[in-house]
């Protein structure tokens, strides 16, 4: 994957942000017409933070339905200082997983290294590989453009004093993890888009 302009913490948070897919990747990763309710379980242990999302299939795009099959749960995991994982599960267990390790090139440039793993299925591996590359090329280009825009804005206006809301689950943990500190244990449940 190409290096991206943007601080390592911003790149990690971009990947783990549960809301950005609706705005940055409409119709690719999430439906643009409306957000469907998502039940969220958030768990923090000393050396990792995991969030599990349970959502109905009506919130999924056609591409997700084709590539993720009968997915029932998806999850994101942050392992300090720079590892992120995503998993997609169905009734038979983990169906697909993405592991990304972020490496700082300099203060404002980050290079991600990604590994995609899928369960053996009917499609040949070479076809799955081509589909994954084609789909993620567009998603990655959108993420890189947004990180560059964010870096430009931070350079021009300075780092803002963000207010933390209920869906800002990973932001504070990422900054703690990047400092080499132990994460503080926490358990939380919430529902996103309950009024959708």
Model-derived segments and their meaning:
Residues 1-196:
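C-terminal catalytic domain of Rieske-type non-heme iron oxygenases
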